[in-house]
A protein has these predicted regions:
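Intrinsically disordered, low-complexity acidic/Ser/Thr/Pro-rich linker and tail segments
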Residues: 1-97, 317
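Per-blade loop-tip surfaces of WD-repeat and WD-like beta-propellers in eukaryotic adaptors/scaffolds
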Residues: 68-74, 109-119, 152-175, 202-227, ...
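Surface loop/turn motifs at the tips and blade-to-blade linkers of beta-strand repeat domains
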Residues: 78-82, 121-125, 177-181, 221-226, ...
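Loop/turn segments within WD40 beta-propeller blades
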Residues: 89-95, 131-139, 180-182, 188-194, ...
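Loop/turn residues immediately N-terminal
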Residues: 96, 104-107, 148-150, 204-205, ...
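Conserved beta-strand element within WD40/beta-propeller blades
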Residues: 98-102, 142-146, 197-202, 242-246, ...
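Conserved blade-ending motifs and adjacent loop-strand segments that build the rim/top face
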Residues: 268-272, 312-335, 370-398, 431-434
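Blade-level signature of beta-propeller repeat domains, shared across WD40, Kelch, NHL, RCC1
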Residues: 396-434
Length: 434
């Protein structure tokens, strides 16, 4: 059978130095040049996408309290924010100063060396929600979140510079930090050295990184897929992770360093009511709105996907407060938590509830690797007569030997609960726990 033309194998001879055939070295060079050009175009495209997602807001929604009068109170860490006599407590990280925000939009700064507090008030300071002392500040600077943005107060008695008298309130100088749409600040956190203040606000879907000394600011979007504002910010103790809780549902765990910004979304079906880190940084304890369940969020190492490591966060149930809690023979129903407060040494935690008139003090047991337990210790009730309930709580350091749990009640009464235990075993002995 004869072969067809299609079946006859062809033999093609290449002449290396023929004029019409390019040099192999030149071919390789052209190929590499084209690949480099295409890669550079791809890199520029991805860089533009990264900038559009991380450094500029996708939308600039401006919700107002007039449109939803209950919104700020619903997401606030204070119980009954609108009517509470005291809305927020903030302790200075290294001194005995304590700042309180009241419902008259005043800041009360207490110093144990003085009986009467210093009062800071301004027409620009309205609807105050939160405050944060600046670390390592020579002038005891205090940032206050409000409707306008941020009111930054400086104690002029500690400054050696001349300031504008129009911005003076007694012994303090006021500087207002504003950003378009970034109104009704809900939460704030200073970074480790006090050079950057991070804030969230109802008026925007981004968070802002402020540098007060240089008057610079950067906008970041923790979750580019959502247009929601953020209600709560919590820096991890090592300042490597920023927890950002959405006003709608879910939260972002953002890892920060000088070269990159990585985020992971957790619990996307529910709004986070409150959250707090343990001082060791191993656990983030949180509860969702409308729930009685306390969860722990733990960094479970990193998984390498191709060349890009991604953080793995494990969420586990710690306990359910729907059940009756027993402390020292007393049994009470707790219900939904309003806010958490953590002892600076990580030995105790305190909880305010949405519908109860007491504060529940807990002992933290994280002796088991990768797990944390909460042991109920005491129901703390108001130490004065009357129908009162707690509105806000905070732990602070009173002296080298004593720490304080400060409880503010709806009538304005301030209660101090002294704590002396320096370790878990010592706390067990004090409270007769085995």
């Amino acid at each position: 059978m004869e072969r067809t033309n299609e079946e006859i194998p062809r033999c093609v001879a290449f002449e290396r130095y023929h004029d019409n055939i390019p040099n192999p070295t030149e071919q390789t060079f052209n190929l590499l040049r084209n690949l480099a050009h295409e890669y550079w175009k791809w890199f520029l495209q991805k860089l533009a996408q990264l900038k559009s997602l991380c450094f500029w807001p996708r939308c600039n929604i401006r919700p107002t309290l007039a449109g939803d009068p209950q919104l700020l109170e619903r997401i606030s860490q204070a119980r009954g924010w609108k009517t509470a006599a005291i809305r927020y407590i903030e302790f200075h990280p290294t001194t005995s100063l304590m700042a309180l925000l009241n419902n008259r939009d005043e800041v009360l700064i207490y110093d144990k060396r003085s009986e009467c507090p210093i009062r800071l008030q301004s027409v620009k300071q309205r609807d105050t929600t939160c405050a944060a002392f600046r670390p390592w500040s020579h002038s005891s600077e205090l940032a206050v979140g409000c409707a306008a943005g941020i009111c930054l107060w400086q104690d002029t008695r500690r400054l050696n510079v001349e300031l504008n008298i129009r911005n003076m309130t007694g012994t303090h100088h006021l500087q207002v930090q504003e950003d378009a749409g970034h109104q009704y600040v809900t939460s704030m956190q200073w970074n480790e050295d006090g050079t950057i203040l991070i804030t969230a606000a109802l008026g925007s879907s981004h968070i802002v990184l402020w540098e007060p000394d240089s008057q610079q600011k950067i906008r970041l979007i923790p979750n580019p897929e959502s247009s929601s504002s953020f209600s709560l910010l919590r820096y991890s103790p090592d300042f490597q992770v920023l927890f950002c809780a959405s006003c709608d549902a879910g939260a972002s765990l953002c890892q920060l360093n000088r070269s990159e910004w990585r985020s992971k979304q957790v619990l996307m079906q529910h709004r986070i009511q409150t959250a707090v880190w343990t001082p060791c940084g191993s656990f983030l304890l949180l509860v969702t709105d409308g729930s009685t369940r306390i969860y722990s969020c733990t960094n479970n190492g990193e998984a390498t996907v191709f060349l890009f490591p991604k953080p793995l966060w494990r969420v586990e149930l710690v306990m359910d407060l729907q059940e009756v809690t027993t402390c020292a023979g007393q049994q009470r129903y707790c219900g939904e938590p309003q806010t958490f407060a953590m002892d600076p040494l990580g030995i105790y935690m305190a909880i305010i509830f949405k519908a109860q008139s007491f504060v529940l003090l807990w002992l933290l047991d994280n002796s088991r690797p990768g797990a944390v337990r909460l042991l109920p210790l005491e129901f703390i009730c108001c130490n004065v007569d009357g129908d009162q309930y707690p509105t806000c709580i905070a732990f602070g350091v009173s002296s080298a030997q004593t720490r304080l749990l400060v409880i503010c009640w709806n009538t304005g009464h301030i209660q101090r609960y002294a704590i002396t235990a320096k370790c878990f075993k010592e706390a067990q002995l004090i409270h007769n726990l085995k």
